[in-house]
Amino acid sequence: MTDLIHDATLDATGLNCPEPVMMLHKHVRELAAGGVLKVIATDPSTRRDIPKFCVFLGHELLGQQEEAGTYLYWIRKKAD
């Protein structure tokens, strides 16, 4: 997958659960409705936690990929 166009980036590299999701929650709150956030993480638990976060809060997971132990996610914030 190529890098999707995004409005903001959250670099959670080196952080472990629950920090990436806590930071994700803060960054999504600050994002405009319909905005896209790119998340960069190294914690494997984000493969489970970030999709569940999106489903639970109604945001759209546009894409995810893994590159040599780095996990990338693109999330579109739901409309207000």
Swiss-Prot record:
GO terms for molecular function: sulfur carrier activity. Transmembrane segments: none annotated. The keyword NADP does not apply. It holds the Pfam family TusA. It comes from Pseudomonas entomophila (strain L48). Sulfur carrier protein which probably makes part of a sulfur-relay system. GO terms for biological process: tRNA wobble position uridine thiolation. This is Sulfur carrier protein TusA. PROSITE patterns: UPF0033. Belongs to the sulfur carrier protein TusA family. CDD domains: SirA.
